[in-house]
Amino acid sequence: MTLNLLIAPDFAPERFAGWHMLNTLLQKRSGLQLHLLTPASAAEQAQLIAEGKVDAVYANPFDAASMIRDAGYQAIARPMGKSDEMVIATAAGSAAGSAASTVEDLQPGCKIALTDNKDVKLIGLRLLEPADLTEADIQWQMVDTHQAAARMAIKGEVDASFFLAEAYHSLSKLTKSQLKALMESKLADITHVLLTSAKVGADAERVKEALVGLTGTPDGQPVLDELGIAGGFEPMTQEDAEFMIDLMDTLLD
């Protein structure tokens, strides 16, 4: 039986090779047949999951919370020292004219670009609290990629853009030189999570052991470094998952 492993579409394109390397290594170490799925958008991810085609998924924390609660997935591992943070950025310099200098400069009716990543939006709204802005106060501009969000900010088509911090920091030097980060979150306890469906059954333990065992090994560590997860992965318990879900609920309140 082949298991489909889906990687959330939250990461920079440069990471794709690393995910394929990881998939190959997990197959070798677990003895399981794994087929990698790399959807281009959140909508494509949702469709694949709804069609029952996803056996394991490296999901962002917001999606992970709903999949654990509503779809019977279980959390088995998470990256160590690799929390999901987000950045609010706007155009740098005077080229953008009235570009915001601080979060407080953003006013009701402002335009903000972002990809369809619910936890980035959720955390971003919390960071906007000093500006006294709610979700309804903002004109949201949905884009497919972080690069598109960056372009809109640089061109002054939006007042700011939301980014997954890893995606922001992986933008080219030229792009980042034209952006100014207004704020970056420091939550620490919210991470992407590897989930498995009930269909995987006892094989979930084999996947977890293969993943957790990569750290510091001659073949595993270079792959982790390629993915920007140098600390590797650690097992995640049901209690750990419930704690993170409670934290997400707090952000929603």
Predicted regions and their residues:
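Bilobed "Venus flytrap"/periplasmic-binding protein-like clamshell domains
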Residues: N4-Q27, E85-A150, E166
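Short helix-initiation/N-cap motifs at beta->coil->alpha
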Residues: L36-Q47, A136-R151, A188-D189
